[in-house]
């Protein structure tokens, strides 16, 4: 996460390339560590008035050549194709899935999938997933739904997007929003 201020909400074309030290992110060695962030998608930041979230590709110092870690640059973009993603994940707190007892495991699966009630979904999980849904919608992400999954502490959200790169950008931005949101709850995410 990096923050840059503008006088007004920028367009994608107004966003500059942004250099960074690739050795800090293990994307370059110290003797030749320059890397560049190239903005490729912009979303309104629902957590900040007049804020923007910017998805970037990592480029070599020339700003044109994709960095070896830049898998997005390899995507053949089909702007007319529709893609749907189901992102499953666990909430983790204190080294174990949220809702798991300190010793052992919760009751066998069954009541958790699309479950309701404190004993099935806990006290904070639903609050987080619903707030995440609202954040995604406010950011313009085509978030299609949420549900509790088969294990305690396990959830899923669905993203449906048109265009190969646009759909991929939306799932990455939705993941980012979820991780940023869970910081305030002291909870980690394990995606699978």
Regions inferred by a protein language model and the residue ranges of each:
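ATP/Mg2+-dependent ligation/transfer catalytic cores
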Residues: 1-148, 166-173, 187
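Conserved short loop/turn motifs at secondary-structure junctions
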Residues: 161-163
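Gly/Pro-rich turn-and-neighbor structural signature
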Residues: 158, 167-173, 179-191
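A short alpha-helix capping/helix-coil boundary motif
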Residues: 110-113, 155-159
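Active-site-proximal, well-structured secondary-structure segments within enzyme catalytic domains
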Residues: 145-158
């Amino acid at each position: 996460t990096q923050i840059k201020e503008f006088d007004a909400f920028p367009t994608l074309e107004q966003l500059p390339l942004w250099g960074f030290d690739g050795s800090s992110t293990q994307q370059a060695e110290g003797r030749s560590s320059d890397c560049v962030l190239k903005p490729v998608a912009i979303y309104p930041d629902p957590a900040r008035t007049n804020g923007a979230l910017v998805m970037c590709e990592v480029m070599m110092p020339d700003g044109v050549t994709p960095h070896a870690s830049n898998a997005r640059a390899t995507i053949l973009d089909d702007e007319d194709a529709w893609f749907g993603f189901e992102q499953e994940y666990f909430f983790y707190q204190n080294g174990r899935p949220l809702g798991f007892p300190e010793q052992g495991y919760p009751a066998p699966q069954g009541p958790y999938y699309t479950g309701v009630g404190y004993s099935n979904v806990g006290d904070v999980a639903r609050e987080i997933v619903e707030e995440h849904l609202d954040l995604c919608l406010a950011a313009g992400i085509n978030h299609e739904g949420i549900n509790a999954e088969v294990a305690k502490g396990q959830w899923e959200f669905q993203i449906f997007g048109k265009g190969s790169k646009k759909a991929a950008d939306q799932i990455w931005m939705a993941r980012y929003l979820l991780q940023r949101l869970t910081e305030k709850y002291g909870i980690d995410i394990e995606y699978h």
